[in-house]
A protein has these predicted regions:
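Conserved ABC ATPase "signature" region
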Residues: 1-16
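Conserved catalytic motifs of ABC-family nucleotide-binding domains
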Residues: 41
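Catalytic Walker B motif of ABC-type/P-loop ATPase nucleotide-binding domains
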Residues: 45-48
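Helical segment within the ABC ATPase nucleotide-binding domain
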Residues: 60-72
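A short, surface-exposed alpha-helical micro-motif characterized by mixed small hydrophobic
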Residues: 86-88
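ABC ATPase "signature
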Residues: 104-105
Length: 127
């Protein structure tokens, strides 16, 4: 219970923990889903668009929590259409186009003069 309350405090929803989930906004449900996944202490998290519906403060909190999780030796796979976030958080990326992986590599090995967005546009023929 303490861990749930700790994460809920970090996400700013501690006062809502006794409310019905059906009354939660999309962002609050997203926060609750993250909390629910973390309290089991997994070594691997798979997240689909985890920043969708989050306000800037909650997004920052989630980024911090993700960085803490990885620094403890854990792994996160997540999908995102916000390439700037991917560039800031990830060491390794895969770009998928029409269901096929068209790039799979370490961000450090990318051309330093090219952003992830530029690489994405090139590989998906949207340049």
């Amino acid at each position: 219970v303490e861990e749930i309350e700790s994460y809920a405090t970090r996400f700013g929803i501690k006062d809502n923990l006794n409310d019905l989930i059906s009354s939660y906004s999309h962002g609050m449900k997203q926060k609750l889903a993250v909390i629910a996944s973390l309290i089991h202490h997994p070594h691997l998290l798979v997240m689909d668009e985890p920043f969708v519906g989050l306000d800037p403060i909650a997004s920052h909190t989630l980024k911090t929590i993700m960085q803490e999780f990885v620094s403890e030796g854990n792994i996160i796979f997540f999908s995102s259409h916000v390439l700037e976030v991917v560039e800031k958080l990830c060491e390794h990326v895969a770009i998928i186009n029409n269901g096929k992986i068209v790039y799979d590599g370490n961000l450090e090995s990318m051309n330093k003069d090219e952003s992830l967005e530029q690489l994405f546009l090139e590989l998906t023929n949207h340049e």
